[in-house]
């Protein structure tokens, strides 16, 4: 399977698979990195999709940069990746985990499909539980 390292507006990313009309944006969770998409890409690419995976702020190749993982930093990056994907694919789906799923729901209006693994659906509730 083809895997190409790309930079999207300074955001480190990997594009998996051959050229296709459909794609998935893959977003990792807390402490994750873009390379986690490889196993998913091995299943999705033979079915006619490409998979684009980015490093969220402070993760993967972005560790050591003075970036925080917060909605005001992650959501604009996800929208930048979506803009990039919209220029290449007719249909964009989402595969996201945990906090990546939460940020995706803030950034992504109408994915063709959404595959969410352990999504954070109630951020306020999560924070209150962690603080008690």
Predicted regions and their residues:
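Gly/Ala-rich beta-loop-alpha elbow adjacent to hydrolase catalytic centers
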Residues: 95-104
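Alpha/beta-hydrolase active-site loop
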Residues: 36, 68-87
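Conserved alpha/beta-hydrolase
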Residues: 41-63
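Hydrolase active-site cap/lid region
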Residues: 109-132
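Short beta-strand element of the alpha/beta-hydrolase
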Residues: 21-29
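The serine-hydrolase catalytic nucleophile loop
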Residues: 30-42
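N-terminal cap/lid segment of alpha/beta-hydrolase-fold proteins
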Residues: 1-18
